[in-house]
């Protein structure tokens, strides 16, 4: 099967509190042969801005991320599993974890919630049947998916995505200093390829995830702005780009571990069109 070919028999599995244990058992088996994990999250937007003086634009971007991730809760996590050839496991390839979220008690940006609601996210069900993040973290830590150098993470403009995962896994606020954030990131996720960061070496590729997918002639499975579908599309985009622009080989020294808009990837945040990182935080990808 060619890399990133769409097969409509691939299924996205919805995970709630009631089936979390069973699905994590399945994932422990899947990760053994399918060690590329494409990831996306849905979260309730941006509600705060950091105040004070900042050493650089990069520092401001991290502090913006930190204050919002500390204040807010993750809503969904999508994980798609693929192998070195970009092939999916038989049956289910994508797991969409739905976390406990309460519109009455939890903070959010109104426009983000409206977007997610229109995308089909069922907030009443999240309130009643959502996964507790601390229990998820316990299972995830022993799943073979994190803390493993053999697992390769694929993402798209993913500072916030990894921010929420680190917050869940450490059960604490994010570090005050960006360098400490990247040290924790490398511990949990030793190998990361951010597709948006890779795009700087891909002539004519531009825009958010949906726009990039259309340029690569990829067909989405499932609804946009849901984490499962977005993670699946991210994985497809990575393998198509690797084939088209990188001759099926990514230079780890140049690309591995860089997140678009943070740290060494921060110089690509602003290209004359305003603050791209805040746009991503509001899920305009």
Curated annotation (Swiss-Prot):
This protein's name: CCR4-NOT transcription complex subunit 7
E.C. numbers: 3.1.13.4
UniProt binding sites for a divalent metal cation 2: 40, 42, 230
Main location group: nucleus
Function: Has 3'-5' poly(A) exoribonuclease activity for synthetic poly(A) RNA substrate. Catalytic component of the CCR4-NOT complex which is one of the major cellular mRNA deadenylases and is linked to various cellular processes including bulk mRNA degradation, miRNA-mediated repression, translational repression during translational initiation and general transcription regulation. During miRNA-mediated repression the complex also seems to act as translational repressor during translational initiation. Additional complex functions may be a consequence of its influence on mRNA expression.
Entry similarity comment: Belongs to the CAF1 family.
Assembly, per entry: Component of the CCR4-NOT complex.
Pfam short name (any one): CAF1
Protein keywords: Cytoplasm, Exonuclease, Hydrolase, Magnesium, Metal-binding, Nuclease, Nucleus, Repressor, RNA-binding, RNA-mediated gene silencing, Transcription, Transcription regulation, Translation regulation
GN (gene name): cnot7
Record-listed a divalent metal cation 1 binding positions: 40, 161, 278
The UniProt record lists the keyword Protease: no
Subcellular location: Nucleus; Cytoplasm
Keyword Ion transport among record annotations: no
Co-factor binding details: Binds 2 divalent metal cations per subunit with RNAase activity being higher in presence of Mn(2+) than of Mg(2+) or Co(2+).
Gene3D superfamilies: Ribonuclease H-like superfamily/Ribonuclease H
GO BP terms in the entry: miRNA-mediated gene silencing by mRNA destabilization; negative regulation of cell population proliferation; nuclear-transcribed mRNA catabolic process, deadenylation-dependent decay; positive regulation of cell population proliferation; positive regulation of nuclear-transcribed mRNA catabolic process, deadenylation-dependent decay; positive regulation of nuclear-transcribed mRNA poly(A) tail shortening; regulation of translation; regulatory ncRNA-mediated gene silencing
Catalyzed chemical reaction(s): Exonucleolytic cleavage of poly(A) to 5'-AMP
Coiled-coil region list: none
Entry GO terms, CC: CCR4-NOT complex; CCR4-NOT core complex; nucleus; P-body
Organism whose genome encodes this protein: Xenopus laevis (African clawed frog)
UniProt-listed SUPFAM superfamilies: Ribonuclease H-like
Single GO MF annotation: RNA binding
Cofactor: Mn(2+); Mg(2+); Co(2+)
